[in-house]
Amino acid sequence: METIFAQSSAFGKAGVAVFRISGPKSLEVLQLLTGRKDFKSRLMYYQQITVPETKELIDNVMVVYFKSPGSFTGEDVVEIHTHGSKAISIMLTNALLNIAGIRLAEAGEFTKRAFLNNKLDLTAAEGIADLINAETIMQHKQAIRQASGKLEALYNNWRSQLLKILSLLEAYIDFPDEDIPDTVLNEVTNTHTILVNTISEYLNDNRKGELLRSGLKLAIIGPPNVGKSSLLNFLMQRDIAIVSNIAGTTRDIIEGHLDIGGYPIILQDTAGIREESSDIIEQEGIKRAINSAKTADIKIIMFDAEKLDSSINEDIINLIDENTITIINKIDLIEASKIFSIENKYKCLRVSVKNNIALSSILKNIENIAENMAGFTETPYITNQRHRNYLQQALSHLTAFSLDNDLVLATEDIRMTARCIGAITGVINVEEILGEIFKNFCIGK
């Protein structure tokens, strides 16, 4: 196995930068950089590091050596903590590249080696990637649980039950003349039924884990000049959309990212929807707005308190569902009695975006819907389409299983189910998917 290195921290100015080296030559490389031979595992040392050929000083650093297998990758590992300077990073990188037998790591290669050395399974590796990419508290909770092995434990439990069924069935096949009790087949049937129900229910999760991982899409919908862009700017706490009293100012979808109650929200301000427009570009914007609303996880539909009759058209009303927040904007410009019937019919919130009236109620409603759609529970959810695909295949094989069929074919259904579950955690040969998983990591991880 080659020795690899990379800067694990972000490149640029910082208090500290961390370089990681992994592989059989790690300790030798450290000795070349420092001129010291007596490093003990798991002790931090304050050292000078120099360019091996010229002895030019690179930096005063902290270094630590982890002897195999007691490291993240399971190999000999060295970490070098330098000052966070671009010049130091470049000098150290060049010095390492000039040492024979060491190369720059590929994206995710350290974690890939940890997997190959049985330090973690594939779900934990994916959890680490999600942890690095987590931007909200709820994303962190989900990722840290997965990185800690909770998904692995769940899938391994199912696989263990399948392997037990497999062993009982193979005993029937291999020893047909033996007097095997009927209770054995009863156990197979009962376990099979439980697994079918459990995996079916698990798949019927409304993609909560995947929504939390990727973010919930929220579309702001309404007629032109109702205050959609002003609401987007309020939610983002900065001006990212042009606000104008000219109808049709927003022509395309404007997007921003937000953390509401720990949930990742992808905000989309859309073109105003109206029934008639002679502007070809605006017509395309309206088409995109409707499509955006149809694919959104959460919708905010805005009505104009001064123009309720024109605000409410069929295209907009048809978009309302259980995950829609309807609001009447500009309530400061009209008497409450004039909007009472519409407010009750569509369960609207009364707000004024311009004057910051009741806007906190919008945030609370978004958080409540997000919690219902992607709320954190004790049972780990599916977080990745790869897992879902294998679980659907597993359920297909499991559903096909029947003791009324040929016993050899029934056994093969169980074997294929176990293989699908094993492919999620990586206990079977999954070389063809490793590149796809680890390419999404950053260099140095």
UniProtKB/Swiss-Prot annotation:
Belongs to the TRAFAC class TrmE-Era-EngA-EngB-Septin-like GTPase superfamily. TrmE GTPase family. It holds the Pfam family MMR_HSR1. Mg(2+) binds at S229, T250. Residues 215-371 form the TrmE-type G domain. Exhibits a very high intrinsic GTPase hydrolysis rate. Involved in the addition of a carboxymethylaminomethyl (cmnm) group at the wobble position (U34) of certain tRNAs, forming tRNA-cmnm(5)s(2)U34. (6S)-5-formyl-5,6,7,8-tetrahydrofolate binds at R20, E79, K119, K445. GTP binds at residues 225-230, 244-250, 269-272. HAMAP family: GTPase_MnmE. One of its GO terms (biological process) is tRNA wobble uridine modification. Gene3D superfamilies: P-loop containing nucleotide triphosphate hydrolases (3.40.50.300), Probable tRNA modification gtpase trme, domain 1 (3.30.1360.120), tRNA modification GTPase MnmE domain 2 (1.20.120.430). PANTHER family: TRNA MODIFICATION GTPASE GTPBP3 (PTHR42714), TRNA MODIFICATION GTPASE GTPBP3, MITOCHONDRIAL (PTHR42714:SF2). InterPro entries: G_TrmE, GTP-bd, GTP-bd_TrmE_N, GTPase_MnmE, MnmE_dom2, MnmE_helical, P-loop_NTPase, Small_GTP-bd. Its cofactor is K(+). Homodimer. Heterotetramer of two MnmE and two MnmG subunits. K(+) binds at N225, S244, I246, T249. It is found in: Cytoplasm. It comes from Rickettsia rickettsii (strain Sheila Smith). The gene is mnmE. It comes from the Bacteria. Its EC number is 3.6.-.-. Keywords: Cytoplasm, GTP-binding, Hydrolase, Magnesium, Metal-binding, Nucleotide-binding, Potassium, tRNA processing. This is tRNA modification GTPase MnmE. GO terms for molecular function: GTP binding; GTPase activity; metal ion binding. One of its GO terms (cellular component) is cytoplasm. Binds 1 potassium ion per subunit. CDD domains: trmE, TrmE_N.
